[in-house]
């Protein structure tokens, strides 16, 4: 029963982010413990602020302490492991305590300040009420008189197998009136239970034996000792596309559950969750919970409560699912581990890999990274024995990898074909349609035409709020900014010189239109951010494609990874050249991964696969290695480049970003921070450090906000983090006449 507590308060700036000591009223002392959410008076006006208790019996900062306003119920309390994750995030991402708290608790489970019925007293109010429902259980026998009705007999028969909820009984035709009558007779007992929600209740439980190939069994056998050991371990499962990595996952999860432990499975994108959920729920049943941002607040809260209450053995979701309140974790799987979506781009700027590694240590679990194209850092670590390397070199069923053809689009143009779809690809699609097979086309540009350029001055029409080109969307007849969302009617004259604007480029909307012209009888599905904006759109559209309601699917990167359709035998890659010349040290890795992954969507069942890559740079070594699907050769080339340029894994890469409405202020803030960092670093001359910049961000302005950055090549250890932390504190203490904000990303790809 603590009399004082240390509270992390919401909305604290980095400089003032510490634990503030509060006194606890006697009637609150039984309710308060580590991890409790509280409402506190803060500042001169004692304004009500949210907080979380991170220390009990804290040392008073003064003789006169303020008292807590209110304490949330124990159901909202952070578990000890999640509390340790809050401290981990605070230490490793330069966020505030409360930013870390918000990361580990979903919106629906949080509270907000409110006023009690007296109109004066500050209290906590739940964002969403905790959902409960009636549950009935059999406690007595039916009296012989009066004669029981058919519905009463049916209710007793159903409840003989165990308690049922009102919804479950009503689904069987048993009304609430019948149940109330039986309760009054002492036959049934009614109680309130937390309402559960099965988001994929239509998936039938198959629970079929998991049959592995000889190579898959060898991979499973290699990983099993690590899974069964109580100590933490890590491994990389590197398998070619279509090698059946998911079957190995299922076998490991089954063994994990047999041990009485739980499993956490991460996928990089929401679009990949339906297929993973289908595999898991059909194999393991209802005790699978889902966590991702496309769930509404109620769904996410109910899933979170299900996990917290011990109702889930398996959790599957995107990056944020790593914070699920799952206990006794035995296995953490990060599928497609190379994807950038596992790194958060807003505070706290964490890497799901780092948090997963921490949770594996906390639970003595196996952390399994998996990919057909592992990140260079992960494969390097496996090569050097820092993590176990397990390979799958053959496709499931013995199918060969797809045959790949590279088409030179310069030759197409010279031959009189100005279209974005080459004659080779057109012919291949036609043959595929005639054979009754399906085609996937990757085009990493949404919209209709990707830019408007003046014929006279050559200026490109750019967003007035961002330093990026506007994109024409034909369906809406608007030009849109894909960064800030600005839109306007498509202009016909250049705003710079009055010349004529010519719309150029090829996006998914135009590709859909071109395909309809070339193949009028084909059913074309477009998969991009526009077509999948509605709730559950990913799942529904992919299900329709799987049911052969479409012949061709054209889309952005969301069609490239993790999808498994047995009748897809052709893949086309369009417009890849822009990615070959993208900024950032991961550019080649990203291109290789994207092409290898999408090519791997073809020929995954009975029939062999074929792929066509269109480019104006057919001799590019990365394209040719991707066409050959030779990851080992690509890795040797990439690791040599990383070593020469001093990039990860040979150093850490920290980017400190500065943003504000006035460019001159942002530039000055970045320069001042760089000077302070140099002063602090001079005190530790043996600290390995290389500072580049400040320079403008790769996109200088987004939504009327200018961006500058400092890039630091470093060793990401406690000494370096302490250096950055002390520099941040000095910078904020100076109170420069600037409204520029500062953000630190320790897991950056080179921008922020």
Annotate each PLM feature.
Residues 13, 519-522, 677-690, 734-739:
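Short secondary-structure junctions
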Residues 1-371, 383-399, 680, 718-725, ...:
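Accessory, non-ATPase domains that flank or precede helicase/AAA+ motor cores in DNA-metabolism machines
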Residues 675, 679-702, 706, 728, ...:
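A carboxyl-terminal module marker
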Residues 60-75, 695-697, 701-713:
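Solvent-exposed, membrane-proximal periplasmic/extracellular interface segments of envelope transport
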């Amino acid at each position: 029963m603590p009399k004082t507590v240390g509270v992390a308060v919401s909305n604290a700036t980095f400089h003032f982010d510490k634990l503030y000591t509060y006194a606890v009223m006697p009637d609150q002392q039984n309710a308060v413990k580590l991890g409790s959410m509280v409402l506190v008076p803060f500042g001169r006006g004692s304004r009500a602020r949210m907080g979380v208790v991170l220390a009990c019996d804290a040392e008073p900062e003064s003789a006169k302490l303020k008292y807590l306003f209110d304490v949330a119920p124990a159901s909202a309390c952070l578990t000890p492991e999640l509390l340790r994750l809050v401290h981990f995030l605070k230490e490793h991402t330069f966020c505030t305590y409360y930013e870390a708290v918000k990361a580990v608790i979903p919106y629906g489970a949080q509270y907000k300040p409110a006023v009690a019925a007296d109109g004066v007293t500050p209290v906590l109010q739940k964002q969403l009420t905790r959902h409960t429902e009636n549950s009935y259980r059999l406690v007595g026998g039916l009296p012989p008189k009066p004669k029981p009705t058919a519905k009463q007999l049916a209710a007793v028969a159903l409840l003989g197998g165990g308690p049922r909820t009102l919804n479950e009984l009503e689904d069987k035709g048993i009304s609430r009136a019948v149940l109330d009558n039986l309760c009054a007779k002492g036959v049934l007992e009614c109680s309130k239970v937390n309402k559960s929600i099965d988001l994929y209740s239509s998936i039938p439980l198959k629970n079929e034996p998991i049959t592995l190939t000889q190579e898959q069994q060898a991979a499973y056998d290699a990983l099993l000792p690590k899974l069964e050991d109580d100590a933490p371990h890590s491994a990389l499962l590197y398998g070619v596309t279509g090698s059946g990595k998911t079957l190995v996952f299922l076998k490991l999860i089954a063994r994990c559950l047999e041990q009485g432990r739980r499993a956490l499975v991460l996928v990089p994108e929401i679009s990949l969750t339906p297929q993973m959920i289908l595999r898991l729920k059909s194999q393991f049943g209802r005790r699978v919970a889902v966590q991702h941002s496309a769930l509404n607040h109620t769904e996410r809260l109910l899933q979170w409560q299900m996990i917290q209450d011990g109702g889930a053995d398996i959790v599957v979701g995107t990056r944020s699912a790593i914070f699920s309140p799952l206990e006794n974790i035995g296995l953490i799987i990060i599928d497609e581990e190379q994807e950038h979506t596992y790194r958060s781009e807003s505070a706290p700027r964490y890497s799901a890999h780092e948090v997963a590694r921490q949770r594996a240590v906390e639970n003595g679990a196996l952390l399994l990274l998996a990919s057909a194209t592992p990140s260079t850092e992960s494969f390097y670590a496996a090569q050097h024995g820092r993590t176990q390397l397990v390979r799958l070199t053959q496709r499931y069923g013995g199918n060969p990898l797809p045959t790949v053809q590279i088409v030179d689009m310069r030759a197409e143009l010279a031959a009189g074909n100005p279209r974005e779809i080459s004659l080779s690809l057109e012919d291949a699609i036609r043959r595929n349609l005639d054979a009754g097979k399906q085609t996937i086309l990757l085009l990493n540009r949404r919209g209709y035409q990707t830019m408007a350029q003046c014929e006279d001055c050559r200026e490109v029409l750019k967003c007035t709020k961002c330093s990026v080109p506007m994109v024409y969307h034909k369906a809406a007849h608007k030009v849109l900014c894909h960064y800030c969302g600005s839109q306007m009617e498509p202009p016909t004259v250049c705003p710079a010189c009055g010349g004529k604007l010519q719309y150029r480029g090829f996006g998914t909307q135009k590709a859909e239109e071109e395909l309809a012209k070339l193949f009028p009888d084909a059913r074309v599905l477009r998969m991009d951010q526009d077509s999948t904006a509605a709730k559950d759109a990913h799942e529904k559209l992919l299900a329709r494609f799987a049911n052969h309601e479409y012949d061709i699917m054209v889309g952005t990167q969301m069609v490239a990874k993790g999808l498994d359709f047995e009748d897809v035998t052709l893949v086309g890659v369009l417009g890849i050249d822009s990615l070959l010349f993208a900024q950032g040290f991961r550019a080649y890795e990203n291109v290789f991964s994207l092409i290898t992954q999408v090519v791997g969507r073809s020929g995954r069942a009975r029939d062999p696969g074929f792929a066509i890559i269109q480019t104006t740079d057919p001799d590019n070594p990365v394209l040719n290695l991707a066409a050959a699907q030779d990851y080992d050769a690509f890795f040797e080339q990439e690791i040599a480049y990383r070593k020469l340029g001093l990039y990860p894994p040979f150093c850490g890469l920290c980017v400190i970003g500065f943003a504000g409405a006035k460019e001159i202020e942002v530039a000055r803030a970045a320069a001042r921070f760089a000077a302070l960092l140099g002063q602090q670093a001079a005190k530790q001359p043996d600290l390995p450090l290389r500072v580049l910049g400040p320079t403008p961000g790769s996109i200088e302005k987004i939504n009327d906000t200018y961006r500058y950055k400092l890039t630091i090549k470093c060793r990401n250890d406690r000494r370096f983090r302490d250096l950055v932390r002390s520099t941040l504190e000095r910078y904020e203490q100076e109170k420069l006449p600037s409204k520029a904000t500062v953000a630190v990303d320790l897991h950056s790809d080179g921008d922020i």
